[in-house]
Regions:
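Terminal helices and disordered tails flanking the catalytic cores of nucleotide-processing hydrolases
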Residues: 209, 216, 225-229, 233, ...
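… and, occasionally, acidic/histidine-rich disordered N-termini of signaling adaptors
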Residues: 2-184, 226, 237-251
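Divalent-cation-assisted or electrostatically stabilized phosphate/pyrophosphate-binding catalytic cores
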Residues: 200-209
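Cytochrome P450 core scaffold surrounding the K-helix E-X-X-R motif
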Residues: 145-148, 194-200
Length: 251
């Protein structure tokens, strides 16, 4: 094989890998009639270490996954693909036990990853019939619930990042959601966006934008757009890490 042929072959493989990764990120329409949701992942390279998925479950339930692998580029993309694959496999055997699910994912990821490779992850199950959100936070930036009255709550219960330790244990948390409440799940690339002076947008910037826009916008998709625009205005679109945001609104 000539050098030119090798370049073409690698380029084709790279495009295929990008397509596969984008296929993992899904927020299909009509997953649940009880929730309005939207998500976006903005990567700094063709392949990245962030991911999100909105998955339909039985009985008007849906799952939200937001993850962030350590590192950047191809290595991070492979790690997050491993996490997503492990999650789908483990879900077949653990049923509704979210703590057991994350423990199984951690075991699989740790066994199949190199040393010091890990990923943070938030996994939440929204029940449309009860309004209850059950979740496990595996070392991830705590998602924020902004209630209709303006009060806020962080979703912190869980355990260590997956793949970091062989025998991590996890705990399940839950919260009762009401009509008009919103959940914001994100990766650190969103809140660590910095301006020219090196100041980070931070959780404060996210909360300010989210709380403000939540009062004047009714659509989750609009909120995602407006929050990314607010971050860009602050950082002048200077992005050094993958940034992901998912918004779920209780209808």
């Amino acid at each position: 094989m000539t050098t030119e042929e090798m370049v073409v072959d690698v380029s084709q493989d790279w495009v295929l890998a990008c397509d596969v990764q984008q296929g993992f990120m899904q927020a299909p329409c009509s997953v649940s009639e009880s929730f309005d949701y939207s998500a976006r992942c903005r990567q700094i390279r063709a392949l990245g270490g962030d991911c999100y998925s909105v998955l339909p479950l039985k009985d008007d339930c849906m799952a939200l996954v937001v993850g962030d692998a350590s590192g950047q580029g191809l290595a991070a993309a492979l790690m997050i693909a491993n996490v997503q694959s492990s999650l789908r496999t483990a879900a077949l055997f653990t049923g509704d036990d979210l703590a057991a699910l994350l423990k199984a994912v951690n075991h699989q990821v740790y066994a199949s990853s190199s040393e010091n490779r890990y990923a943070t992850m938030f996994y939440g199950v929204f029940d449309g019939s009860t309004g209850i959100l059950r979740y496990v936070n595996a070392g991830h930036n705590p998602p924020i619930v902004i209630r209709r009255d303006g009060s806020m709550y962080c979703l912190e219960t869980g355990g260590a990042p997956v793949g970091l330790f062989p025998d991590s244990e996890y705990r399940e948390g839950s919260i009762q959601l009401e009509t008009g409440d919103m959940v914001f799940a994100f990766t650190d690339g969103l809140i660590e966006a910095a301006n020219q002076d090196g100041d980070e947008w931070g959780v404060h910037g996210l909360l300010k934008a989210a709380a403000c826009e939540a009062q004047c916008s009714q659509e989750a998709g609009d909120l995602v757009d407006l929050i990314f625009n607010s971050m860009d205005d602050f950082s002048k679109e200077h992005q050094t890490d993958d940034a992901t945001l998912a918004v779920v609104r209780v209808i």
